[in-house]
Amino acid sequence: MLRRDLLALARLVAVLTMACLLACRPAPPTNGAEQAAEVPADTTANDTAGGDEESHNAVTEVTPGPDVGGTPGERLQPTDLTYEGAFRLPEDFNWGARGLCFYPNGAGGNGSLLVTGFELLFDPAHPGESCYDPNWDCGAYCGEVAIPAPARAADWHDLPEATLLRPLTQFDGDLAATVHREYVHVEDLAYVPRRGSQTQDKLYGSLVVWYAEGAFGEDTFPTVWLANLDGTGAHGMFHIGPHETPFHGRKMGAYLFTVPTWYADQYLGGRTLVTGRCRGTPADGTEPVTTRGGSQGPTLFVFRACDTDDPTGDLDALPMLYYRVSFPGCAGPNVGDPANCDYPDFTMCDEWTGGAFVEGTGRRAILLLGHKGLGNNCYDEPPVNCHDPCSDDHGYHCQPYERQVIFYDVDALGQTALGQHNPWTVLPYTIWRPTEFYLGPTTCWNAGGMAFDRENRRLFMVERGLDDDTNAAVVHVWSL
């Protein structure tokens, strides 16, 4: 049932996407319209053999654009990370693990990982099926695992398996289904110690509506909720920021993480929670270049954690990063030109699923983990055939694809939050393609969540897609 259900969902989204594209033809340029930013070219790549201990493999240093601040001498680099090995997640997390966070109090104070379960909202009485029946009790689930000593093995089956400390538990109180029952992906989660008058620590969850254009048209929607660590006391759904540009549900929810207090105080007015998403569609297609709707590149929006057990209203937020949408100029079906994109070589297939603020040894960066299209924005609809070896479904194809980790200067992003320059002018300074992944950097399967253990300076990344249709997950570990 699982594979058939997901294929049906993929076919449905392709049909709906085509309908949206036909209805959203941009109007001709008008006087005073913003022009897309010039895209800097990449410089040389430093490729080394996969699996090396320092993990400085397949790195591209991005040529800086206009000076937008930042602190080059304090930028984290892939050479600062040492690969420690990996471990398997229990099969409970097959077709899941899109979200990951480190829980410092778990496993008797040794720290554990909280991991999202099946990627769709579902009813345990109907495992592996999307929530198409209105009578089903569907929700978002997560579990807790101990962190075993990571190991290296040629076959991922030989890796140690994490022990399940807490079984998959619903933690959204049926709230996510109020956004949409079928078009939702359960994306990420973040642990936040109790604040203000709260009586318990909190677990924040986030979602994306994977075809928001079909579900909401040009309207925005909420993407975040919170609950107690045991899943009770859920409140939401919350909209990130006010219902005005540049805030929009299409820019939120794919990843969720916290930043250090010192950084929040210096740049973000004390706000510590960050979310974002890459969804390259405009709100309505009436402008040649716009900040309304999605973003043609990853986004970062920081918001304030709640201080009460029963919060209401929109969450107080600031933009740190987003890119303008030039449609169809940048990534229109079969006609888009990357020269019109703010983000270098953006494609409509780009998906970023994990994020973390990583720091140590006097260096720091915000890292995003994702699956990047490297080809043209081909839209497979007769008579066009994109000949994508990863999928023969209708819709966008941007093969080949690769997993990337992109590094952003935290000071440049902080200066954006202070209003010192436009969010779309900040680019990643390094692109890293870890070769430790079992499927390699170039694969049809996307990545999963990312988390950072600040005390022990460990970075965790989820690799999905093992055993093909089983979509098993492995967690890779680096130290700093």
Go through the PLM ranges and name each one:
Residues C341-P441:
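Loop/turn-rich, solvent-exposed surfaces of beta-rich toroidal or solenoidal domains
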Residues G69-F93, N105-L175, L229-I240, C398-Q399, ...:
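Beta-propeller domains
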